[in-house]
Amino acid sequence: MIGRISGQLAEKNPPEVLVDCNGVGYEVLVPMSTFYNLPGLGEKVSLLTHFVVREDAQILYGFGSATERAAFRQLIKISGVGPRTALSVLSGMSVEELAQAVTHQEAGRIIKVPGIGKKTAERLLLELKGKLGADIGVQVSVSSDSQSDILQALVALGYSDRDAALALKALPKDIGVSDGIKLALKALAK
């Protein structure tokens, strides 16, 4: 599975971006919240990803934070909600707004998202209740390759996105990968 993509931002056409990685351009679909926070064309970009393989397509979805990716993964587990619908939900409202709507059982807020009807909104509320809050408690934007590498290493070691994000948030921004992993593991062991 492809967990992260880093490279030069070659094109931006909502909701799709093209990331050039050593001469190979990868098309990545991103929610609008991530799209608006992307750097300018030609600048370096790093996105956490979710890779979807279907019979007729292979699609890479990109996210600016581990929290956003975790919410996407929770959404696509719901019957009747595919990756495109999940992307639409995350484009129409922030992860925090979604978590709030789920906590307060506000279907009306979710129905405002294009492509989401009353039944789908109610199913989202029912199936996300108690699940979404655990992953949404902390949002960490990955601002450097070393932070992204630390986050990926912690997730690969079996820690949840939330626990890895909490550990990463406590680290100094300019820490190296190996030192960062060691400190994060010590913090997680407590």
Swiss-Prot record:
Start and end residues of each stretch annotated as Domain I: 1-64
Keyword Cell membrane: no
This protein's UniProt keywords: Cytoplasm, DNA damage, DNA recombination, DNA repair, DNA-binding
Region of interest called Domain III, as start-end residue ranges on this chain: 142-190
The protein's name in its UniProt record: Holliday junction branch migration complex subunit RuvA
Region span, Flexible linker: 137-141
One of the protein's GO biological processes: DNA repair
Protein function: The RuvA-RuvB-RuvC complex processes Holliday junction (HJ) DNA during genetic recombination and DNA repair, while the RuvA-RuvB complex plays an important role in the rescue of blocked DNA replication forks via replication fork reversal (RFR). RuvA specifically binds to HJ cruciform DNA, conferring on it an open structure. The RuvB hexamer acts as an ATP-dependent pump, pulling dsDNA into and through the RuvAB complex. HJ branch migration allows RuvC to scan DNA until it finds its consensus sequence, where it cleaves and resolves the cruciform DNA.
Family: Belongs to the RuvA family.
Gene that encodes the chain: ruvA
Subunit composition and interactions: Homotetramer. Forms an RuvA(8)-RuvB(12)-Holliday junction (HJ) complex. HJ DNA is sandwiched between 2 RuvA tetramers; dsDNA enters through RuvA and exits via RuvB. An RuvB hexamer assembles on each DNA strand where it exits the tetramer. Each RuvB hexamer is contacted by two RuvA subunits (via domain III) on 2 adjacent RuvB subunits; this complex drives branch migration. In the full resolvosome a probable DNA-RuvA(4)-RuvB(12)-RuvC(2) complex forms which resolves the HJ.
